[in-house]
């Protein structure tokens, strides 16, 4: 076999072999979009497009589909002005729901142009969704997808997100696909509070020991749930127009205090001060009750 024929055979063969994501380009920062992370050819994750210039940039780069996994309503008007379509697949910080994974699979199978996936800031949910999408399309192996999440700064504290990627399997051919919608009706405050109620019910059982032993014996699981509580407060605070303008400052201050209280609980657990963590949790519950009395129960 002469060298020319051998070279052509090798080139053709290599095109059929899975090509890994180039990890040499560790981080891409684009002027109009934060957390610009590639998950293979034609698939990128990042933060929420902040306005017209960001949508114009995406359109200019050949993107036609944007997937939002954030809870907030996408900016459909700006996207449409630049010929972009949205798919809204809201997801939480505790893992990728099967319906969201199927939605990502359908997007990647249908799209014949680059896809941009975003959450709010581009660190956690967006890269996780992009990791799932990259495996669904065959752009990344599981190992490569996880490496991309690390590059994006996805926190190890969100163990449910990492588990979702590690356990992802392609759907069976007969699996019904979900309807893809540009915007899913929702309320960040209500959704966050439902999640917080569920998490606190679990924590309440561990808080029944006066010396904090319940937190100590379930350390990792408790810390994971406190992280979810912190993110729940952050999401709830983003819901606009839930209080009168005259109460807005007090509303925001209460959420900031609650987030600070959770950080103190987490630090107490890192320092293995279980009784202090338990006391902090009880104080957090007291703050929640006071807020409910003023804004929910009146």
Each model region followed by its residue ranges:
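A phosphate-binding catalytic loop at a beta-strand-loop-alpha-helix junction
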Residues: 114-131
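Bacterial Sec-dependent signal peptides at the C-terminal "C-region" and cleavage site
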Residues: 5-22
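Cysteine-based protein phosphatase catalytic domain of the PTP/DSP
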Residues: 41-113, 137
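Sequence context surrounding c-type heme c attachment/ligation sites in exported
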Residues: 143, 147, 151, 182-298
């Amino acid at each position: 076999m002469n060298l020319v024929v051998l070279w052509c055979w090798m080139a053709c063969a290599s095109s059929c072999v899975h090509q890994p994501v180039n990890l040499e380009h560790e981080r891409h920062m684009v002027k109009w979009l934060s957390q610009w992370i590639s998950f293979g050819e034609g698939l990128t994750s990042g933060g929420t497009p902040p306005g017209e210039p960001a949508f114009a940039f995406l359109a200019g780069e050949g993107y036609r589909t944007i997937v939002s996994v954030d809870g907030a309503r996408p900016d459909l008007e700006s996207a449409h002005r630049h010929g972009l379509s949205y798919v809204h697949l809201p997801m939480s910080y505790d893992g990728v729901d099967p319906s969201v994974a199927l939605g990502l699979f359908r997007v990647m199978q249908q799209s014949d142009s680059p896809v941009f996936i975003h959450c709010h800031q581009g660190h956690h949910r967006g890269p996780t969704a992009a990791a799932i999408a990259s495996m669904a399309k065959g752009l990344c192996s599981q190992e490569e997808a996880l490496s991309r999440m690390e590059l994006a700064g996805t926190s190890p504290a969100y163990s449910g997100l990492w588990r979702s990627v590690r356990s992802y399997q392609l759907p069976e051919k007969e699996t019904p696909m979900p309807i893809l919608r540009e915007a899913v009706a929702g309320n960040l405050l209500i959704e966050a509070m439902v999640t917080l109620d569920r998490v606190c019910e679990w924590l309440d059982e561990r808080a029944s020991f006066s010396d904090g032993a319940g937190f100590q014996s379930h350390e990792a699981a408790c810390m994971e749930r406190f992280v979810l509580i912190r993110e729940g407060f952050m999401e709830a605070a983003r819901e606009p127009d839930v209080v009168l303008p005259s109460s807005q400052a007090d509303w925001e201050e209460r959420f900031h205090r609650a987030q600070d209280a959770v950080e103190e609980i987490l630090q107490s657990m890192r320092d293995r001060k279980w009784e202090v963590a338990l006391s902090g949790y009880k104080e957090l519950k007291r703050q929640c009750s006071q807020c409910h009395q003023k804004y929910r129960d009146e």
